[in-house]
Amino acid sequence: MSWIFIGLLVFFVGAAAFTALVAPLRQHSNIITRTPVVKSYIGIDDFNNTDKGVMFEAVTTPGGPADQAGLVGGDVILSFDGQPIQNEDQIEELMEKTPIGKTVDVEYIRDGQKKTAKLTTISQDENRRLTREFERRPEGRAHFGYEDGDAERVEVPGTNTYGVRLGTILRSRPADLAGVKEGDIVTAFDGVPIRTSEEFLMRVRRALPYSTVKLSIVRKGENETDPVEKLEIPVKMGKQ
């Protein structure tokens, strides 16, 4: 019986030692496989493939890399950090591989012209901080007075550029009081080129309440033969 007892004792001691050795290795393996991908952010979103590159709809992070570099929604990105971009998967993959804090060249097309900008990537935490800082600013959000769902990206008559045609203008709101009309095509908001409806919405939200902004518009006449007017309309913003 003593030999059986000794054998069992040796077996259990060995099993415990093996478990103690293997458990940390398994835990370490789980840690490795669960490590999240560290991705760089540049403050833009919602990419669309084009025949020349990748267009994005809006600068989504006020004060972020793309915003500081002067990019706006509607720009078509041709290359990122020297790498040609042909579809949205490529730029997403490149942002995953680009180190946080790296300064890169971004080649893009706006209004048919090729341009280059430099921007420095940021972390997800910094991107969230900037977004949160904007959303919680004490001044609040501005109000323009239009149905954003009715606005659409259109070609500006007689040009190779795009603007945003406004739909419903709400009565007795800032846009209406300033003389903005349904069908007006917005080409700039306080000097910022407007090429997509999403970018226009972001710029409206970013304006300070009760500030006066300059709206650049193109207005078509009632008849097809009427000349196209280019107007600069000052709009005193409201507050949401």
Task: Locate the predicted segments by residue.
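PDZ domains, with a preference for the canonical peptide-binding region formed by the helix
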Residues: S79-E107, A188-S216
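Residue-level signal for short segments within beta-strands and strand-turn junctions
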Residues: Y108-R110, S123, I217-R219
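Extracytoplasmic
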Residues: V37-Y41, D51-V54, T61, V72-G73, ...
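PDZ/PDZ-like domain segments forming the peptide/carboxylate-binding groove
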Residues: D45-S79, P84-Q86, G149-A188, V192-R195
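Solvent-exposed loop/turn segments at secondary-structure junctions
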Residues: P84-I85, Q113, D125-E126, P193-I194, ...
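PDZ/PDZ-like peptide-tail recognition elements
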Residues: L21-E57, T120-V164, T168, R206, ...
